[in-house]
Amino acid sequence: MTEAAADPVSATWAALAALPRPTLAELFAQDGRVGQLAETLELPGGTIRFDWSKTHLDPAHLAAFERLAEATGFAQRRRALVAGEKVNVTEGRAAEHLAQRGIGAEASVEEAGSFHARMHMLVEAIHGGALGDVRHLIHIGIGGSALGPALALDALARDNPLVDVHVVANIDGCALEAAFEACDPQTTMIAVASKTFTTIETMTNAASALAWLEENGVTDPYGRVVALTAAPDKAVDWGVDETRILPFREAVGGRYSLWSSIGFPVALAIGWDEFAELLEGAAAMDRHFVETDGAANLPLRAAFADQLYTRLRGCQTRAVFAYDERLRLLPSYLQQLEMESNGKSVTADGLPVSGPTAPITWGGVGTDAQHAVFQLLHQGTVIAPVDFIAAIQPGDGLDPAHHRILLANCFAQGAALMAGKAADDPARSYPGDRPSATILVEELNAATLGALIAFHEHRTFANAVLMGINPFDQFGVELGKQIAGEIDRGGVRFDASTEALLEAAGIGG
């Protein structure tokens, strides 16, 4: 017996690699193609249609990938995630983001509910004027503490927010200064979002924001600060009033934390009822993910397509194009979610991985991106599977022609990538057979946005299970931060190139 035959995971990968590779044209010559690969979910806030018919998935691949999911213990890993077991094995923690949406271990769900109640009270107090005239919030965080809130705010709070929110992540002072210029210090609160309350970028920006309040005559600057953290004691030590601290559990990872107290700026801008709809939309997707098996489980099916292209066809990138201006930040959000989770080279057991892991996630907003990167997608030598995401209902009140043209372009790009077009002039020839999937939201609102984000969280988890890795740690970000601290403190010598850069910038020593 060969080693691959003895190992069901390796054997299944080998069987997948041996499957025929029909073209998309050949697949579409078969009856029922769209019915096999497209499905519409009924969700709070409207439907979402998921269509993988323009990918190279076929019944044989779906069946083989289902066997892979069984061999890798997908059902068991999913059960452990929901039960609050320590699925983050390297750090010995659970991953409790589902509990924030009411799914999971009873104790975790109850605690999340109590934290939400505390946040709800503070949001209502601010809206009711109990904390004075609050018109602006500067939300300071980085990574998941900023990307999730920024995405939700850009999608849901564009028109007449209850409080004007500015998200600041970068340590570059230009970012914070721009927020200062847009806000009146007398009517501004500061939210400091840091899981550990030690993140250097966040705490440096927070100190500068506090100084800005003081310099502009705010008599009680600490009274204007809200801390969103899993380390409330550190927030108290920093000077935040205990009544202004909104805690969350350490087992809620940063890139999965929008649903926790990190969502405070979103709730403040759109109101608690709409924030609750965001949670319920995510919970509806959770229920689908938890209760559905095999390829009918849509996040798992998305992972099957991801693995088909990354592992079996050597695609090193995956592109995401949102044909909706309100989702322009989604590609950046997914970059962190997918690459920080699954950009690993060892398994959850600490062994070298046997194949490629997360591809590079990139993208943009349509139709802008068509005039920038689609040349490469259609005629370049790099094959990048594409996800197109659009909403059926427009988000504007302008002439319907705007939205009709937008959707026409979205659907046309997928059709063109698949079909291609022959020409006598090679420079005008399109090879076609290039894959894409389409996610079509009936209406973009808080509930469907919550479902869309949760879908990608579960897709990321499913990919991790199929690859045998832990998606809940991120040790790869630590070394650069460590060296940056050494540079800032001085007294450490580095390689010749780095020393020359330090000298040129005048920060060596």
Task: Give the location of each predicted region.
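Glycine-rich phosphate-binding loops that contact phosphosugars or nucleotide phosphates
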Residues: 121-292, 486
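Short glycine-rich or small-residue beta-strand-to-loop segments that form or flank ligand, phosphate
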Residues: 136-141, 190-196, 317-324, 360, ...
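Short, solvent-exposed amphipathic alpha-helical segments in soluble enzyme
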Residues: 152-157, 181-185, 206-209, 243, ...
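C-terminal structured subdomain/cap of oxidoreductase catalytic cores
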Residues: 446-495
